[in-house]
Amino acid sequence: MPGIKVHPNESFDEAYRKFKKQVDRNLVVTEVRARRFFEPMTEIRKKQKISARKKMLKRLYMLRRYESRL
């Protein structure tokens, strides 16, 4: 869980910016949104399969693009 130490000479805005940056780095908000509703295992697998396909197609595109430059 994100947490920061506020120094005595630090303004609220600076501390708030630090906290927001730490929350973004730890992906807290995205995880909370993902867990907001129950998702069956079949849906999770389906999303993983789709993302794996997208990743593979992206790699294939980059490889073909690289080969065409040789």
Curated annotation (Swiss-Prot):
Gene3D superfamilies: Ribosomal protein S8
Record carries keyword Ribonucleoprotein: yes
Gene Ontology terms for molecular function: structural constituent of ribosome
Keyword Ribosomal protein: yes
Entry's Gene Ontology cellular component terms: ribonucleoprotein complex; ribosome
Pfam families: Ribosomal_S21
InterPro entries: Ribosomal_bS21, Ribosomal_bS21_sf
Family: Belongs to the bacterial ribosomal protein bS21 family.
Protein name (Swiss-Prot/TrEMBL): Small ribosomal subunit protein bS21
Organism: Campylobacter jejuni subsp. jejuni serotype O:2 (strain ATCC 700819 / NCTC 11168)
